Amino acid sequence: MLHNHRKKIDKLDITLIDLLEKRFKITKEIMNLKDTAKIPRTDSLREHEIIEDLQKKSKLDKDFVEKLMKLIFKEAKNA
């Protein structure tokens, strides 16, 4: 029983990482487009809107969602 749950968690972890890799790839493309257009790479308003929207849609703790997304935004800019 425990083993089965751990296998499910392992699969979910792989999916999370795969999705983050895809997100970071798209973010890099967006950064390149912004650089070409000479517009700021960071859009704090958009980031705030994303966090608020996810907090409304998620059953997770709002502070956790904010911390997670801020970490994702930060890492995406460095990817």
Feature locations, PLM:
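Domain-level signature for soluble enzymes in the chorismate/prephenate branch of the shikimate pathway
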Residues: M1-A79
